[in-house]
């Protein structure tokens, strides 16, 4: 076919310029290899050149699809978190009937983490760690969109008498989020020690168990002498 190109070290099917429709796989490969390198080495220790080389393409493709390295990682997190954001927003905007809607949020959150097992490690390394490079952006773009909305929903449920009158909705939100995510953070220990495998039918059972645990802890009491 075409004579060898003397300008750029080539990937087998890569040519300079705008990617074609078949190059959607390139975008996914960049996300996949970028995620793996980030988890292995940390955000500050990985270059766009390294990510591109691992994906078998050029740094120009990172700039084309994502703008820069931060944009690539932002897209990676958005793809995982957006269904959860949508679920919380929908719950906030509708009257709902209390507990079943909260269970839907818990289900969305836990399924999101189960489907993206890299997510807890990324959050610990790049958000929770003192030197995490993505903490500010994660708070601004994701946490700030879900946590206040979740608190508002819990406050509404309390005011409508479905949750205990003395319940602090902020504390309840922290408890709900912790119940949903910590089992996956601790999986490297609970997996081999307890045989915990949150997948398939076991994941469904565990989600139901967690939702029941939360519900019974926050629900309004009907017996006299309780609030």
Tell me the role of every PLM-derived stretch:
Residues 1-14, 108-111, 115, 144-160, ...:
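C-terminal peripheral helix-coil segments that are non-catalytic and often amphipathic
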Residues 2-20, 32-36, 45-47, 55, ...:
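Short glycine/proline-centered loop/turn elements that form peptide/ligand docking sites
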Residues 25, 29, 33, 37-71, ...:
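Helix-turn-helix
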Residues 78-83:
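Short, basic, alpha-helical segments at the C-terminal edge of helix-turn-helix-like DNA-binding modules
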Residues 89-121, 169-176, 204-207:
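Hydrophobic alpha-helical connector segments
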Residues 100, 137-142, 159-175, 226-227:
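All-alpha amphipathic helical-bundle segments outside canonical DNA-binding/catalytic cores
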Residues 101, 115-137, 187-193:
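Amphipathic alpha-helical segments used for helix-helix packing
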Residues 122-126, 141, 175, 179:
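Short acidic/histidine-centered micro-motifs embedded in hydrophobic/aromatic stretches
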């Amino acid at each position: 076919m075409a004579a060898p190109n003397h300008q750029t070290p080539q990937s087998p099917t890569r040519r300079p310029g705008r990617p074609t429709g078949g190059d959607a796989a390139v975008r996914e490969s960049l996300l996949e290899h970028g995620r793996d390198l980030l988890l292995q080495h940390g955000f500050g220790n990985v270059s766009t050149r390294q990510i591109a080389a691992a994906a078998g393409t050029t740094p120009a493709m990172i700039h084309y699809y994502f703008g820069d390295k931060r944009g690539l990682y932002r897209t990676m997190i958005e793809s995982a978190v957006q269904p959860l954001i949508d679920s919380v927003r929908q719950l906030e905007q509708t009257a709902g009937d209390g507990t079943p809607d909260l269970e839907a949020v818990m289900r969305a959150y836990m399924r999101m983490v189960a489907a993206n097992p890299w997510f807890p490690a990324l959050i610990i390394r790049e958000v929770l760690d003192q030197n995490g490079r993505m903490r500010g952006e994660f708070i601004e773009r994701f946490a700030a969109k879900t946590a206040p909305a979740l608190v508002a929903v819990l406050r509404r449920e309390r005011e409508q008498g479905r949750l205990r009158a003395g319940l602090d909705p902020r504390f309840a939100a922290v408890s709900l989020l912790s119940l949903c995510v910590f089992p996956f953070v601790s999986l490297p220990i609970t997996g081999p020690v307890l045989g915990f495998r949150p997948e398939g039918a076991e994941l469904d059972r565990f989600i139901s168990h967690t939702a029941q645990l939360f519900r019974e802890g926050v629900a309004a009491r009907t017996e006299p002498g309780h609030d």
